[in-house]
Amino acid sequence: MTQHDVFVATEYPAPVVRAVIEVALGTAFQPSHGPEPVPALTIGPTKVFFHDSHPFEDDADFAVSRYRYWVNVEDSARDQQRQLAIAQRVFDAVKAEGWPAMLSFGLQGNLAVYP
């Protein structure tokens, strides 16, 4: 399944960034259960995962090293329109805070970048 991702650059601590996303999506992150537990929230069949960091490096079409946080959005029903709509809400929320952000699809370049 291909996912949408939002990368965020800010010096604010993770709880502040998560709180902005929670307000935008109207629900709270909960600890996820897995080998690498990361905070996650659920909106219907769509899950939003918040990572304090990411393992990605820059390439020609994907300059990601400037971003500190990684928000991964995946829809278990494979509804890419719903998945994109939720990722866009996350992107818009962090953009409204004035934080640099990038919205991508499948980690293959960007759909939107701010600023």
Q: For each of these PLM feature ranges, what is it?
A:
Residues 21-23, 46, 89:
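Hydrophobic/basic alpha-helical segments enriched in Actinobacteria
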Residues 81-115:
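Acidic, proline/glycine-rich low-complexity IDRs
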Residues 8, 28, 47-52, 80-83, ...:
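A short linear-motif detector with a strong N-terminal bias
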Residues 1-30:
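Short, extreme N-terminal segment that most often corresponds to the first beta-strand
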Residues 11-12, 72-79, 106-108:
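Short, flexible beta-strand-to-coil junctions
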Residues 5-7, 47, 68-72, 100-104:
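Ordered hydrophobic segments in well-structured contexts
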Residues 28-77, 114:
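Short, intrinsically disordered low-complexity segments
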